[in-house]
Regions:
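ATP-dependent NMP and nucleoside kinases share a basic, alpha-helical "lid"
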Residues: 93, 101-135
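ATP-binding Walker
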Residues: 12
Length: 185
């Protein structure tokens, strides 16, 4: 199977690109959705979070307590990622099995380390991304700035870069061009 990861910073347009690729008939999987539907409520993950952070309440991960812990101990983010990423990737590969080509929308491309894949980076200027996040999530400028600061990772090396600061029609043309360069259409 050929796996192509779609990544980019918050508000960059990853979901828009992924939705368009799906509309073209390709298998597209959202790693956040996999985490939220398959991983976060699994007994082994809950036990691991309790062991690592002690942030389980009434048999579920207490997201607020976990966020507070990570805010106070940012070095523990790596432990959280080590607990979550292998589980998400296993579910992704299970779901994608049987497809010749599969796209995966990922927040953290490092989660796919050790798995052969291509990387498509969706970009947009910070001001454009902030507007999108505000419209989508109803967040204040201060909240958005804090979220951007937490996720201010360097842009990964990408096989394809798609600038989404354009009209919907132009973005579709850019994605089609990327699909052609990848010899998928």
């Amino acid at each position: 199977m050929r796996l192509i990861a779609i990544t980019g910073p918050m508000g960059s347009g990853k979901s828009t690109v992924a939705e368009y690729i799906a509309s073209r008939g390709f298998a597209v999987f959202d790693c956040d959705r996999i985490f939220n539907t398959c991983v976060i409520n699994s007994p082994d993950y809950i036990a691991e979070i309790e062991r690592l952070f002690g942030t389980v309440k009434d048999g579920k991960v207490d997201k607020k307590a976990l966020a507070a812990h990570l805010g106070a101990h940012p070095e523990d983010v790596a432990k959280l990622n080590a607990a979550a990423h292998p589980r998400v990737v296993a579910k992704l590969l299970e779901a994608a099995c049987g497809n010749d080509v599969a796209f995966a929308e990922v927040q953290v491309p490092e989660a796919l380390a050790g798995i052969e894949h291509e990387l498509w980076l969706v970009t947009a200027p910070a001001a454009v991304r902030a507007k999108r996040v505000a419209a989508r999530d109803g967040r204040s400028e201060e909240e958005i700035a804090a979220m951007f600061a937490l996720r201010n990772a360097q842009e990964p090396m990408a096989d394809e870069v798609i600038d989404s600061d354009c009209s919907p029609g132009e973005l579709r043309r850019k994605v089609d061009a990327a699909l052609r360069r990848a010899k998928l259409i």
